[in-house]
Amino acid sequence: MTSKNQLELLHKECRKCIDCSLAETRTNVVVAKGNPDAEILIVGEGPGEQEDITGFPFVGRAGKMLDSALNSVEIDPLEDCYITNIVKCRPPNNRKPSLEEVKSCIPWLDKQIDFLDPKIIVLAGSTAVESFLNIKQPISKIRGEWIEKDDIKVMPIFHPSYLLRNPSKEPGKPKWLTWQDLKKVKKVYDSF
């Protein structure tokens, strides 16, 4: 069985998940979107309202911001990336996922990574960084620096929803810094 077939089976299993209380309030399990053969994996925090409705990650305002940021450095969000979240179900009122919810969901992400075998992982926001890297530092301190995990290059960036709240493109501001971070991702991506 190919990795792609294994990934499809994993996603079918994931859509049936009832391992935490988020299963009681979700509309859809939001597994992933994008190219399963991509070398870039983008991991966010969790689905929002629009994602819960559609069943796909990053389709709301934050998703449009992410697409725009990626396109600005000539990374195609659907062809060059595979996009998922730490938790696959929407936390009520878009709250931060609890530790229990993260612990229930992280095995799904680990299996996705096994099947995808990405060369680069972009972690969008502090929840993704804390959950995946087990690092508790402000995203403002850790973003923009490459971290190695299991021979994969990992780049923490600000979450796109944070950029919506901080829209200035002035040098040194979050949106400008994210653009710099994604240029680093593009440079490494182009080297493969």
Which residues does each PLM region occupy?
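A polyanion-binding, active-site-adjacent surface
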Residues: M1-F192
